[in-house]
Amino acid sequence: MYLEVSERQVLDASDIAFLLENSTSPYDYGENESDFSDSPPCPQDFSLNFDRTFLPVLYSLLFLLGLLGNGAVAAVLLSQRTALSSTDTFLLHLAVADVLLVLTLPLWAVDAAAQWVFGSGLCKVAGALFNINFYAGAFLLACISFDRYLSIVHATQIYRRDPWVRVALTCIVVWGLCVLFALPDFIFLSASHDQRLNATHCQYNFPQVGRTALRVLQLVAGFLMPLLVMAYCYAHILAVLLVSRGQRRFRAMRLVVVVVVAFAVCWTPYHLVVLVDILMDVGVLARNCGRESHVDVAKSVTSGMGYMHCCLNPLLYAFVGVKFKEQMWMLLMRLGRSDQRGPQRQPSSSRRESSWSETTEASYLGL
């Protein structure tokens, strides 16, 4: 059961000074949310035992589902690479980002189950890789939303002229921003031995103010801004589709709603918990042992919900799409024929037939 502590058990001045001078916060983007740092002397048995049981199982499951699902999306997209639209290219990058993110989960599973055994170098790389692809997923979804907004609402294709150059530049900017946001991981993450827990963990080594600043950056740049872009774009798209004619509008409306709802449902709970933690960091909410234990467990559960978005992406952007199943089946059939008869040349077709793009939908994925 949760640790029941009186609300009067608020940090005194000596506890706060100890926290600011000795804080070594863990990697705080969800994969290891228990405070393994030299935090105020609160018992952490419940949250640590919960993480050791819950996180390894969850991360292993998400690793398998995310790898298989996004691998299937990437395979189908690459099979149509000569006819990819701008949104298709963003979706391919999104699948790659999700794959790279889930590839770090086994490392964090080991860290949660026992301790970090991979050294400081891999700690920095794994932490930065996770952070880069966390931001990349949100930014690419925003790019897809904006591309659909221009195409459907304004009937404008900004990537029609020199499409490969413009799409490539957009992707370079997105990945560049993600690397920039991950610089603190390269600098401050390290494998540190926690004497209180007698274990080594991949964690940040900087004052509490730096930990709070990173959480605010994640909340604003990695969640609120992309969500606002998606909500604005898809609200206008829905307005246009509601006055359009034909049965296709209902299918497009369903997918549009699912896009925004899935992102919000998966990530909103986690960021609300992070907001509570930020408010405790800055003193707006009193930090006590009971509340801290509840927040630690809540971060573990809600971060798992957020990572589920990597597994949902193939379902939302592929399996719900109009032509993905058909293209996946054709790809499997071609692979089967290749094994039996040797390599065969794919029949030529027009861009409209082979591309994942249509006039009112972004791609065969159905966006």
Curated annotation (Swiss-Prot):
Sulfation on Tyr-27 and Tyr-29 is essential for CXCL10 binding. GO terms for molecular function: C-C chemokine binding; C-C chemokine receptor activity; C-X-C chemokine binding; C-X-C chemokine receptor activity; chemokine binding; signaling receptor activity. The modification Sulfotyrosine is found at residues 27, 29. Residues 339-367 are annotated as: Disordered. Residues 78-89, 147-168, 244-255, 322-367 are cytoplasmic. Its main location: membrane. The chain crosses the membrane at residues 57-77, 90-110, 126-146, 169-189, 223-243, 256-276, 301-321. Residues 1-56, 111-125, 190-222, 277-300 are extracellular. Disulfide bonds join 123-202. GO terms for cellular component: cell surface; external side of plasma membrane; plasma membrane. The keyword Zinc does not apply. One of its GO terms (biological process) is immune response. It is found in: Cell membrane. It holds the Pfam family 7tm_1. Keywords: Angiogenesis, Cell membrane, Chemotaxis, Disulfide bond, G-protein coupled receptor, Glycoprotein, Membrane, Receptor, Sulfation, Transducer, Transmembrane, Transmembrane helix. The keyword Transmembrane helix applies. Glycans are attached at residues 22, 32, 198. It is a multi-pass membrane protein. Homomer. Forms heteromers with ACKR4. Interacts with PF4/CXCL4. Receptor for the C-X-C chemokine CXCL9, CXCL10 and CXCL11 and mediates the proliferation, survival and angiogenic activity of mesangial cells through a heterotrimeric G-protein signaling pathway. Probably promotes cell chemotaxis response. Binds to CCL21. Upon activation by PF4, induces activated T-lymphocytes migration mediated via downstream Ras/extracellular signal-regulated kinase (ERK) signaling. Belongs to the G-protein coupled receptor 1 family. This is C-X-C chemokine receptor type 3. The lineage of its organism: Eukaryota, Metazoa, Chordata, Craniata, Vertebrata. The gene is Cxcr3.
